[in-house]
Amino acid sequence: AVLAILLATLLFTSLFTIAISLQTAMQESNMRTTGTSAHAGIKRLSWEEYEKLSSDTGIKDIGYSIIIGNAVGDDFNKTPTELRYGDETYAELTFNMPDTGHLPEQKNEIATSRIVLDAMGLPDKVGTQMELTITTDTDTYTDTFMLCGIWDGDAVAYRQTMLLSKSYTEQVAPVIHGET
């Protein structure tokens, strides 16, 4: 009887462990596919609206990003890549936090995934210079950037991301200039 109780206990413990592990794996897979672990995403907020939201005590973490545009060129035909500015919280919530180096701080610094670097044929080494053409809703820019941060990236994501500095974003992002 004692053996039967032990075996039944082991069986139920194993079943619950497997079920919880499966649920966790499914949640992680969904987050990776959508590109974020955030519970909500709100687009096209003004800065005043963002500040109002961020002061809400019911919100645990809040980050923001500004979409700049898309990387263009043959290197990006099979690896769609968008360029944006994102604060540290945004980078963490979207799995874009560098594990080598740091987020962009200086005007022409850039951070990206090893997937993008492979597509461009560049080494995953901080300090690497890269020329990049960016298309926004209103213009096209070609600039040289210095790689300051690198993360693994995720092949299941619907697009890859390159993060640019706030000062560069303020110079080129159409939304900041009231053009979109």
PLM regions with names:
Residues 20-180:
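Basic-flanked hydrophobic alpha-helices used for secretion and membrane insertion
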